[in-house]
Amino acid sequence: MDQRPKFGMILFYIVLGVFLMVALRGLYTTDTNLSVPYNRFLEDVNDKKIIKIVIYDDGRIVYTTSESSKRSLETKVSPQTLSTDRFQNYIDQLVTDGVNVVYEKGNDSLFWVNLLGTIIPLAIIVFIWFFAMRSLSGRNSQAFTFTKSPAKKYLSNDKNVTFKDVAGVDEAIEELQDAVNYLKNPNAFSQTGARMPKGILLVGPPGTGKTLLARAVAGEANVPFFYISGSDFVELFVGVGAARVRDLFSQAKASAPSIIFIDEIDAVGRHRGAGLGGGHDEREQTLNQILVEMDGFDAKTGVIVMAATNRPDILDHALLRPGRFDKKITVDPPDVKGRAEILKIHMRGKPVDPDVDVWLLARRTPGFVGADLENLVNEAAILAARRKKKIIGMKELEEAIDRVIAGPARKSRIMNPKEKKIVAYHELGHAIVGLALPNAYPVHKVTVIPRGSASLGFTESLPSEDRYLVSRSEMLDNLAQILGGRAAEEIVFGEITTGAANDLERATQMARTMVCQLGMSDRLGPIAWGKEEGEVFLGRELTRMRNYSEEIASEIDNEVKKIVIEAHERARKLVEKFRDKLDKAAEYLIEKETITGKELAEIVGLAESGNYYRDPLAETKGSKRKVSAVSTNEEAKEGNEDEKN
């Protein structure tokens, strides 16, 4: 309901009342009489200038003087200035002098006007105060509720999320199962003398499903779930954060067994005393209150505190000690099997073509986390709806991957034939170098379709399997592949363009990482140069401490330059080797706009030995690759149990 018209009418009546009060007061007090001081009255009496005096019972005194035949002057004397005895003496003297003395009844209206003139302003002030207090204490105001916790409470019957809705983090689920069992049956732990951790910290990159895991624990245990972000505690007023912490924990204890989940706890749990000012602030007071509340738990409380962060290195040590967040669970990005399971979960309830190859999609998305995969499926659903299709097909899902990686296709960006030709040779330079080098990532496809805000085309290379270690030879081959585009421009056109700017930046950074962090320089040896260290609130670019001399810095620069130049020369030699096949490949790419790594390998004569993407599961045919064949965590667990039996 809109309150503005009601407030406007109230304001109108207030203004009208003030106006009438002023008008009435002016009406009854408007006269041209002069208020004279007591001395002037005495002078008029002694000089016998008074010809008439009127005394009102409301205390007013009005007298008329006649200083000449032309005019008379009526004046008022305040009775408070006259004592009763002396005033009566003056009246007697005036009567003796023949002055007309009259006693009259006072003006009652003027009395009420004066009274209202005093009461109405007070009434207006009281009314405005009452109206303001009522508005501030309404449901839409937090003026008097800012000390209450803003945590969202999810009850046990509010569309519970369970472990069946989580995939790709089997180890984390196994660790969290203890928390579920504790919430369901705390006595089972106390019988063995075990103490359930008071706090569980979920650590992992953004989007890996930390919040989803916490909700799944609450759903599995069927207990209330209190969700709050670390930034929700701290407000403008001092002490609000600590008050909200107390209120949150009191609510959780009243609803026990329950779970408190603090997302992004690094917003409030950073190292104390690490701010630029160095002093105590509201954030530290809030953190202290969290520590105190967690110390107040006992085994019978039935409340588990969970938190999530992607910056565990900046958390205060007191927060991580035993008795507080003493259990840390790492939530890693999913592997290829986990990605396939996550894709199936996000495809639930959506009209997906049964022939969709989720294993290929999972292998095309290395490094994707759960949030990325959810976005991928959603993008595919949007594309299917845009094309007026009733089901989501493999084509939409593959295009969605390209949209997530490189942005949407810019079909309206029309390049002239010369620029399109340069882009084609540039991308083929990347691809051919990748095909020829055995340790580079296998080439999956090449396209000259512009995507995103800056990309005019791209070459997609995929690892054949999930990798956790990278060798020096692999890094050098990938470095040469990155510089293959610039090498192709130099050889084919005899000049370079701005298209290789990002390639040079990536190549330089990779070479510097090899020298400074990985000890892969023959000249400088197995030494890590520089140390990442800094205060909590300093920017990332200021956190790398330089612990070497100017001479070493010069040698580092020379070594980085040497690695990049050598990789560039390798790329040039490989492009020159396949120069006779490059023109044919460019014509084919410009015509088709997108070609696979296998097609390019056949054109340049590397069909057998070329390093293009070969599906590791190519021999797995039929329904085993389809979306319906991907197992969820529950199905996988059942399968493991069957194997054990």
From Swiss-Prot:
Gene Ontology molecular functions: ATP binding; ATP hydrolysis activity; ATP-dependent peptidase activity; metalloendopeptidase activity; zinc ion binding
Active site annotation, chain numbering: E427
Species: Kosmotoga olearia (strain ATCC BAA-1733 / DSM 21960 / TBF 19.5.1)
Highest taxon in the source lineage: Bacteria
Keyword Metal-binding in record: yes
The keyword Nucleotide-binding belongs to this UniProt entry's keyword annotation: yes
Protein name: ATP-dependent zinc metalloprotease FtsH
Database matches in InterPro entries: AAA+_ATPase, AAA_lid_3, ATPase_AAA_core, ATPase_AAA_CS, FtsH, P-loop_NTPase, Pept_M41_FtsH_extracell, Peptidase_M41
NCBIfam families: FtsH_fam
